[in-house]
Design a protein with these regions (language model features):
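Beta/coil-rich, acidic/histidine-enriched accessory regions frequently appended to metallopeptidases
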Residues: 1-76, 94, 102-109, 173-182, ...
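Short surface loop/edge beta-strand patches of beta-sandwich-type extracellular domains
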Residues: 77-82
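Non-cytosolic beta-sheet module surface loops
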Residues: 83-85, 95-99, 156
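Extracellular Ig-like/FN3 beta-sandwich strand-entry sites
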Residues: 86-88, 159-161, 250-255
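Extracellular beta-strand-rich recognition modules
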Residues: 89-97, 162-169, 195, 258
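Short coil/turn motifs at secondary-structure junctions
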Residues: 98-100, 113, 169-171
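Exoplasmic/lumenal beta-rich domain surfaces
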Residues: 109-161, 207-240
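Extracellular beta-strand ligand-recognition surfaces/modules
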Residues: 154-174
Length: 292
């Protein structure tokens, strides 16, 4: 069989009266040694009920299109654009991206043959560098550092209807947050889309999203007084939870594990823990879930 070293878990100690605020990564865990007490006490937990999806808010409005994240992703966002009545055209796009540098790429693409073939458009922030062989042409990789506006010449496609596409492609290794689009403009045809509604976009993997996702948290309390010697307490939709620890035997060591598990994001959230000797009306005030 395999031999593994036991992990060295770091923890902080809490006492009766402790009032702690900390941040936590999604799908991470924090560990706390709880006080050994000869009388009952309460663990109060409160955390952000919503967590940022990305490290940026929408550039305008309340929503943006998001590529989602993951390994072996090939997500597309496509719609028809009518350039049949103009002889020149310019595409302006508001983009944000955090993409694994040199391995994963995002693209702005057009097709003049109803999607049979596609051409990647060159922008100021795109690159043709192809260190891993994964770049399909003019791709976006690395970090944008905030919302950027890139401009593309659509004049070669004027006089016809075309398909416009945003595509995000990843390999089977590490993945970053992905790509977001929050504005598309073609002034010559009066086309302005602030991405607040689907507006004829055909999404395959992309999602029209607000800037936050619901916060999800669980507490695991190592409690020798419980039948299984541990208790799982899920925080409510308000991010709050309450647990009563009964008097402990001096030889027992109660512990608290805080886990954050919000979907589709790795952004940090903030939580607060209070260790109180009695129930001073907080059950009503916090409106959390109580476990006896």
């Amino acid at each position: 069989g395999y031999k593994f070293d036991q992990p060295n878990v770091k923890y902080a100690s809490l006492d009766i009266g402790s009032d702690l605020t900390a941040d936590i990564n999604q799908w991470g865990a924090d560990y706390y040694k709880l006080p050994q007490n000869s009388s009952d006490y309460y663990v109060f937990f409160e955390a952000d009920p919503r967590v940022p999806l990305l490290p940026v808010l929408p550039k305008k409005g309340q929503k943006f299109w998001y590529s989602d994240r993951g390994d072996l992703v090939d997500s597309t966002l496509t719609r028809q654009i009518d350039l049949s009545k103009v002889k020149k055209a310019t595409l302006q796009v508001d983009l944000w991206y955090d993409i694994e540098t040199g391995y994963d790429y995002g693209y702005v693409m057009v097709s003049r043959d109803a999607g049979k073939t596609w051409t990647t458009l060159r922008g100021k922030h795109s690159t043709t560098s192809n260190p891993s062989g994964n770049n399909l042409g003019n791709g976006y990789t690395g970090k944008s550092g905030g919302w950027i506006t890139d401009t593309f010449d659509l004049t070669p496609y004027a006089g016809r209807k075309i398909l416009l596409r945003f595509e995000y492609v990843t390999d089977d290794g590490y993945n970053s947050a992905g790509m977001a689009v929050d504005g598309v403009r073609i002034p010559e045809i009066g086309f302005y889309d602030d991405m607040e509604s689907p507006n004829s976009w055909q999404a395959n993997g992309w999602v029209l999203s607000g800037p936050y996702v619901p916060g999800r948290y669980s507490l695991i309390i190592l409690d020798a007084n419980s039948p299984e010697r541990y208790v799982l307490v899920d925080a409510g939709a308000d991010g709050r939870a309450i647990y009563k620890l009964s008097a402990q035997d001096p030889k027992d060591e109660p512990f608290l594990i805080v886990a954050a598990k919000s979907d589709n994001t790795l952004q940090k959230s903030i939580y607060r823990i209070q260790i109180l000797p009695k129930e001073p009306g907080y059950l009503t005030l916090l409106a959390g879930r109580a476990s006896r």
